[in-house]
A protein has these predicted regions:
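Single conserved hydrophobic/aromatic residue that forms the stacking wall/gate
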Residues: 1-5, 9
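Distinct, well-ordered alpha-helical segments
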Residues: 6, 17-32, 47-55
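Catalytic beta/alpha-barrel core
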Residues: 10-19, 35-45
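His/Asp/Glu-enriched short active-site or ligand-binding loop at hydrolase and phosphoryl-transfer sites
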Residues: 36-43, 58-72
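Terminal-tail/helix-coil boundary detector
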Residues: 56, 118-164
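Glycine-enriched alpha-helix->loop->beta-strand junction motifs that scaffold or abut catalytic
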Residues: 10, 27-36, 53-62, 104
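Conserved, mostly hydrophobic/aromatic
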Residues: 13, 37, 54, 64, ...
Length: 164
């Protein structure tokens, strides 16, 4: 990447699923830092240390799987439902607002127009410190989706065919 970085047409790069150690290694061997790191981030896997590191390094934290792919009953979780009811919102909106208030960029996937509109309607309410702490208490510190530090998992992802 270093030779490409000196090109007149240089652009910002982004990375995905880079842990702090992998990013530090990247910094040591390249001239340009990524502008964004997309990592799994949701109420059950909050990536608190990564968020601090990314902020210190001037790299934007982007959430991948902000709704934990529906794992662990996220849309029925009592803490999230209580907050949603208090604000007259959906659990999805509460999660998106929580990420936004933490400075985490999120681009939620949806194919339904109504859901897209709902996902955008998060900027006219604010979660209290108490609500933010309540959501912080849901962190398990690990992914309910997959372990990207597990060698067989990484090999499987690397050999997964996306298109014919």
């Amino acid at each position: 990447y270093s030779s490409a970085a000196s090109d007149v047409y240089k652009r910002q790069i982004g990375v995905t699923s880079f842990g702090n150690e992998r990013l530090q290694d990247l910094f040591l061997h390249n001239e340009v830092k990524p502008a964004v790191n997309q990592i799994e981030t949701h109420p059950f896997f909050q990536q608190k240390e990564a968020n601090v590191f990314l902020q210190q390094e001037g790299i934007q934290h982007e959430a991948w799987a902000p709704f934990a792919e529906g794992k662990n009953g996220i849309f029925q979780h009592p803490v999230l439902k209580t907050i949603a009811e208090k604000h007259g919102r959906t659990v999805g909106q509460v999660i998106l607002r929580w990420l936004n208030q933490r400075g985490v960029v999120v681009i939620p996937k949806s194919v339904r127009k109504e859901r897209m509109m709902e996902n955008l309607d998060i900027f006219n309410f604010t979660l209290t410190d108490e609500e933010m702490k309540g959501i912080a208490g849901l962190d398990t510190g690990k992914s309910p989706i997959y372990d990207d530090m597990d060698l067989p998992t990484v090999r499987g992802i690397g050999t997964h065919k996306i298109h014919d």
